[in-house]
């Protein structure tokens, strides 16, 4: 397992959830929620620098049948734009099926009501995404997901 902090990004239509791993890549935690739109990529680039991120994982919405629709196209666009801003830090796309559903369930079990969940579910979904990516790397011995073209170096 490569050492270094990883960030994960769950892009929603209103908010962008961000999660962060520990330096050993064992545990993912919700980190920040950013309003989607003007300035969101700037903030993601700042976080990448501030956290000295090894890589950034962007959630790729995929249907149960494995198809990618409009949301996946939007996620790919965000990933490409982010990759151009933070190069040479790699950006990877990773399947985000069930992340929001799982995050809602975990928050509900933790006693959060619907209103409280709304503000943090995006970061919690990013944490679910990042934990899955970390577990995937641990199981396979390879960086998770699909490297975004033009994203710079591949982290060793």
Q: Where in the sequence are the language-model features?
A:
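Phosphate- and other anionic-substrate recognition elements at nucleic-acid/protein interfaces
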Residues: 1-9, 13-156
């Amino acid at each position: 397992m490569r050492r270094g902090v990883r960030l994960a990004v769950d892009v929603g239509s209103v908010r962008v959830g961000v999660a962060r791993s520990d330096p050993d890549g064992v545990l993912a935690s919700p980190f920040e929620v950013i309003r989607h739109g003007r300035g969101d990529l700037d903030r993601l680039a700042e976080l990448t620098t501030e956290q000295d991120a090894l890589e950034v994982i962007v959630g790729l919405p995929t249907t149960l049948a494995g198809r990618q629709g409009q949301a996946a196209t939007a996620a790919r666009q965000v990933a490409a734009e982010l990759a151009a801003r933070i190069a040479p830090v790699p950006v990877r796309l990773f399947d985000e099926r069930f992340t929001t559903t799982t995050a809602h369930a975990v928050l509900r079990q933790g006693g959060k009501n619907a209103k409280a969940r709304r503000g943090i579910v995006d970061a919690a979904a990013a944490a679910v995404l990042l934990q899955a990516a970390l577990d995937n790397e641990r199981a396979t011995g390879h960086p998770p997901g699909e490297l975004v073209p033009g994203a710079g170096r591949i982290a060793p």
